[in-house]
Amino acid sequence: MLMPGYSLIDKLHLKLTLWRRSRFILAGRRIMRRIGFKYVRMIEFVRPLDAPIPIIETKLKVEVRPFLTEDSENKIYDRICFTPGDNLPLHDKTLRRVASGNEECLVAIVNGEVAGYIWLLFIGTNYEPAIEIEETFAEGEGLVYQLNVFANYRKKYIAKKLINNGLSYFKSKGYRKCYSYVESDNMPSIKSFEGMGFHPSRVITCLRIFKFKRKKEANSQR
């Protein structure tokens, strides 16, 4: 008769212990956020290019085309920032990236407006600021990254269309596989990449310091 009662008490004690631990973990995370620390989890996705690429039908008529040097004078790109720190409307940083020959920016156009874009890295090294690491890609390995679809055009399969065009480009050039990096809380992007045949290969965790960085940057500007 004692054993069932003991088991019940034991289970309640275990639940209470786990609850206390979870409270400590949550409290610890809140304190870390308040002082400027944050855990960033990035998922690395990979996709072999010998697998068929799904055909995507968007809900709107979309034209996907590369951003070219002469496009810097095109009015539809005036207020669009393809690269952080771009000097609009000159797009100086974007043009340098395109001119390097290592990268290309694919732009989705809907009714004469930019709906979104995605970057392709053909060869070389990519720096991920969110997790503060550099990844070098071998010959035959490409990177599809910095996917961005503007709010008015989301849920129209435009993200998948951009990924589709990126994969098709890499496959036409004889690449073997394609990578991408997505933050673990960015569910729309995760679903888009998984829907295009990507699968997670690893999770990278980084402890970032945000408030200290901002203060440091502010002091450096004085």
Stretches found by the model and what they are:
Residues 85, 101, 109, 113-142:
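Conserved acyl-donor/pantetheine-binding loop and adjacent beta-alpha core of acyl/acetyltransferases
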Residues 146-149, 155-172, 177, 191-195:
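Conserved acetyl-CoA-binding loop-helix of GNAT-fold acetyltransferases
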Residues 184-202:
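Conserved active-site alpha-helix within GNAT-family acetyltransferase domains
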